[in-house]
Curated annotation (Swiss-Prot):
It comes from Mus musculus. It is found in: Mitochondrion outer membrane; Nucleus membrane; Cell membrane; Golgi apparatus. In contrast to other members of the phospholipase D family, contains only one PLD phosphodiesterase domain, suggesting that it has a single half-catalytic and requires homodimerization to form a complete active site. It is a single-pass membrane protein. SMART domains: PLDc. Belongs to the phospholipase D family. MitoPLD/Zucchini subfamily. The active site is at residues 153, 155, 160. One of its GO terms (biological process) is P granule organization. Homodimer. Interacts with MOV10L1. Interacts with MIGA1 and MIGA2; possibly facilitating homodimer formation. Interacts with GK2. This is Mitochondrial cardiolipin hydrolase. Disruption phenotype: Males are sterile, because of meiotic arrest during spermatogenesis due to demethylation and subsequent derepression of transposable elements. No spermatids were observed in the mutant testes, and no spermatozoon in the epididymis. Effects are caused by defects in primary piRNA biogenesis: in contrast to wild-type cells neither mitochondria nor associated meiotic nuage (named P granule) are aggregated. It catalyses: a cardiolipin + H2O = a 1,2-diacyl-sn-glycero-3-phospho-(1'-sn-glycerol) + a 1,2-diacyl-sn-glycero-3-phosphate + H(+). Its EC number is 3.1.4.-. Its main location: mitochondrion.
Length: 221
């Protein structure tokens, strides 16, 4: 190899080293320039087919995936499902009531994909007919509930410790299809931190090893 060839090799190596050194800075710059997610959903949701989302996460819904007669279009429910199904590592759910079959299937899909799912719920409402909590527990998902006098009335989810989903919506078919409700989906480090701290505080408080053996629980409205 001649002297000029060695110079080319040296220059290429130096260029590669500089590129690798600049890569972390470039990634930080790109991430800093990306707008954080801000999305507001309003309910009641249009009734649409969600089978394509629930059978093949990440694919857009379409008539080829399901022969049903429901519209195969975007809706508030499908957008909420997409936000949940974007989870790759963790999902924290803190929900007063959870009886929506579609949302229940989405949570089970995430569990099957290896996402760590933890659920906090209200002990009275988890026992109601149609609740998804029993199915989630049967699937091996960790669930904790309250044992005190007040309702566990929170309604929020945290996706990958980065995205907060919260609002007035109970995760029930009644609320999704009939009620005037709202859901905010947002990436905000400070808000996510505060909600995650609240989740961890309640998770520790609802540790079943700390329950009294004969709880005295009486609730009013």
């Amino acid at each position: 190899m001649g002297r000029s060839s060695w110079r080319l090799v040296f220059a290429a190596g130096a260029g590669l080293a500089l590129a690798l050194e600049a890569l972390p800075w470039l990634m930080r710059w790109l991430l800093a320039g990306r707008r954080p997610r801000r999305e507001v959903l309003f309910f009641p949701s249009q009734v649409t087919c969600t089978e394509a989302l629930l059978q093949a996460p990440g694919l857009p819904p379409g008539p080829s995936g399901c022969p049903c007669s429901l519209p195969h279009s975007e809706s508030s429910l499908s957008r909420l499902l997409r936000a949940l199904l974007a989870a790759r590592s963790s999902l924290e759910l803190c929900l007063f009531a959870f009886s929506s079959p579609q949302l229940g299937r989405a949570v089970q899909l995430l569990h099957q994909r290896g996402v760590r799912v933890r659920v906090i719920t209200d002990c009275d409402y988890m026992a109601l007919n149609g609740s998804q909590i029993g199915l989630l527990r049967k699937a091996g998902i960790q669930v904790r509930h309250d044992q005190d006098l007040g309702y566990m009335h929170h309604k929020f989810a945290i996706v990958d410790k980065k995205v907060l989903i919260t609002g007035s919506l109970n995760w029930t078919t009644q609320a999704i299809q009939n009620n005037r409700e709202n859901v905010l989906i947002m990436e905000d480090t400070e808000y996510v931190r505060l909600f995650l701290e609240e989740f961890e505080r309640i998770w520790e408080e609802f540790d079943p090893t700390k329950y009294s053996f004969f709880p005295q629980k009486h609730r009013g409205h």
